[in-house]
């Protein structure tokens, strides 16, 4: 994947996360979202955080959550965990739901 292709796909991930947080906040969720360059910080009511950031040199998107740190690469049309193969948005949904204590959905 070229650098340009990576940046286009990775920025689309950040935009989708932002849209999903907005949609969750339109419901019962209260998630504070802060963007600083290529880093998104999601802060939940209980003070816990999830950080999503881009890693251009490695062509990866990373998630840091209570559950741990996870690296995702674009493989076969989806961002996949480099260890487990889990899809990015499905995994982020699980981490956010766990930390928020309520269902939070993320999708592309």
From Swiss-Prot:
- Output the InterPro entries linked to this UniProt entry: CyaY, Frataxin/CyaY, Frataxin/CyaY_sf, Frataxin_CS
Q: What does it do?
A: Involved in iron-sulfur (Fe-S) cluster assembly. May act as a regulator of Fe-S biogenesis.
Keyword list, A-Z:
Iron, Metal-binding
Q: Which organism is it from?
A: Burkholderia mallei (strain ATCC 23344)
- Gene from which this protein is expressed: cyaY
- Pfam families noted in UniProt: Frataxin_Cyay
Key word Iron present: yes
Q: Decide whether keyword Translocase is in the record.
A: no
Q: Which HAMAP family match?
A: CyaY (MF_00142)
Q: GO molecular function of the protein, one example?
A: ferrous iron binding
Q: GO biological process annotations for this chain's record?
A: iron-sulfur cluster assembly
All disulfide bonds of the chain are none
Q: Which PANTHER family match?
A: FRATAXIN, FRATAXIN, MITOCHONDRIAL
What GO cellular-component annotations does this UniProt entry give?
Answer: cytosol
Task: Report the sequence similarity comment from the record.
Answer: Belongs to the frataxin family.
Supply the name of the protein. Iron-sulfur cluster assembly protein CyaY
Q: Give the source lineage, highest ranks first.
A: Bacteria, Pseudomonadati, Pseudomonadota, Betaproteobacteria, Burkholderiales
